[in-house]
Amino acid sequence: EIPFKIFLDQWVIKNYRYPQEAVEKKIEGRVIVALRIDKKGILSIKEIIGRNPLLEEEACRIFDGFPQLSPALQRGKPVNILYNYPIVFRITE
């Protein structure tokens, strides 16, 4: 089984697209996506913190269709977890 952080990174890299309007307007920034993985391993977005709606919308879209995971375990029992995931949007020439 792939560790959670590595799986998450791979998912984001695979699904990341810089919004065209943000490129045209030269908008860059960082967005924090507050994720919750419940006891069944289902991911949901609790909050998105950023300074630009275009980047926030893209950060949310990245997680569309995210597959069900194995839940986190504490003392052998499934538990809910919260995880803050930063996404940096930087235009490269």
Task: Report each predicted region and the residues it spans.
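Generic short beta-strand
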Residues: 34-35, 46
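Short proline/glycine- and basic residue-enriched helix-capping loop/turn segments at helix->loop/beta transitions
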Residues: 1-33, 55, 60-93
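Short, charged/polar surface micro-motifs in flexible loops or helix N-caps
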Residues: 40-42, 93
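Short glycine/proline-centered loop/turn elements that form peptide/ligand docking sites
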Residues: 43, 47-56
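Residue-level recognition of short loop/turn positions
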Residues: 38-40, 75
